[in-house]
Amino acid sequence: PPPPGPPGLPRIAGKGGISDYFFGASYGDSGTIPPPTPLHTKLSLQNDLRVLVHADPTFMAMNVLKRQFEGLFGTGISSRALSIDRLRQEILSNAARKSSRYDIIACDLPWFGELAQKGILRPIDDLLSEGNVDLGDFHRVALASARYRGEQCGLPVQTTPELLCVRRDLCDAAGIGVPFTISDTLETARALHSRSQGRSGIAWNAARGTPLGHTFMFVMGAMGRPFLNLAKIDDDYDAEWSTGENLRPVLQSEEAFATAEYLRELLDFSPVSILSMSWYERARAYADGEAAMAYCATLLAPLFELNKDSPAYGVTDFLPHPYGPGGKPIAPVGGYALAIPSNIEPNRVGAVWEALRSLTSPETIKLYIENGSLVTPRFSVSMDPDVRRISPVISIVDGMARSGVLQYWPRPPVPEITDLIEIIGTEIHDMLQGAKSVSAALADAQNRADALMRSRGHY
């Protein structure tokens, strides 16, 4: 018999193990999305379309397709790709210029609160009111992540949740099921951990600062509570409109302590380099067969989903974050949206909007996937038969978006999010190194985060 599924999620018949929980086959056949066609009139720009993006598979596909886009737009494209930290710095320094040196910028979803509050992004509601974008086709939480206090500031170009990737073949060989809960995950990691075979039980982000800060926030969300005291709405939390006391950190809560203890227990089944491991290293360890499981952003799934030499090729189950006693299955969303800088020359806005709309269209996002990306923020692209044949992960994420598993409240886009992540990731790293107790690390994180939010006048 099939293993039991996570609560509240239907099992859909099919092959391929647990991935079937989220497989998109039940949504009916969709038509095939055609390739992009040239714009009716070429973009009316005096010079090249200037784009600032992140160095990842989606934007690398955009770069590979540069000549094709130049043909579609009828103009040259000048593109610059930076690592995540350099990208944020460049966006901030560009905002200080009288006139933006970029027409379109790619923004990490949690940055939208900070960038919108500082007036760095041009709201696009007036452009959307023309009615030529089907907002209902986007994953709801990706669209909400690119909004700030009711104003839409960008359109998603990729949705890349962090999931638990599990080697189904190793679980089968060990006679165990794949994990759904936090306690399951510890047991599975223990069972599959084998130093003699050069394999760790699990790889995850435990590098100091930003990487570990993300892990803590996401796991605490799966324990059933965000790290800020966000207002509750039905079964979820308000990550858009919360103010005052609802922005107070809750790092002295039961869920925060449970998260810290869980991460400390994971150390025993983790790679020796775990305390310097971040996004790429953990995905690489999993892809190379050095870890039986990994918390992994789907953005990096091509390392094993499209690589036939990987031991994980074709034998990976993509699961939501394992949940704690008070939690439920969640997939914390990440990704990027394209936005227009507020200091762009006004006479460029019309043409740039045409380009941004085209670069986030179903036709173009399908093109990214055909050129090495495995992420889409659009339901229509996930349902395309050509796309579904490439990898099950695309349909799995689509199913999570439809069933409410995809969430952005574990890492809410508040203006201070970058600093808060850094604070938590620094204090918890001290704890994992043995320099502080769990209670001391959480007290220090609470005090520092609380001082930051007070200094910004939230309460």
Give each language-model segment a name:
Residues G24-T41, L109-E162, V315-L319, R388-I390, ...:
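Hinge/lid segment of periplasmic solute-binding proteins
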Residues A189, L230-S276:
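Glycine-centered hinge/linker elements that transmit conformational signals in sensory
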Residues P35, Y313-H321, E370-T426, D430, ...:
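Long, aromatic- and glycine/proline-rich binding clefts that accommodate carbohydrate-like moieties
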Residues Q68-F138, R147, D169-F180, A285, ...:
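Extracytoplasmic "Venus flytrap"/periplasmic binding protein-like
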Residues L109-I120, D125, V141-V178, A206-G244, ...:
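Periplasmic solute-binding protein
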Residues S93, S100-D103, G131-L170, S200, ...:
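A structural signal for short loop-to-beta-strand junctions that line the ligand-binding cleft
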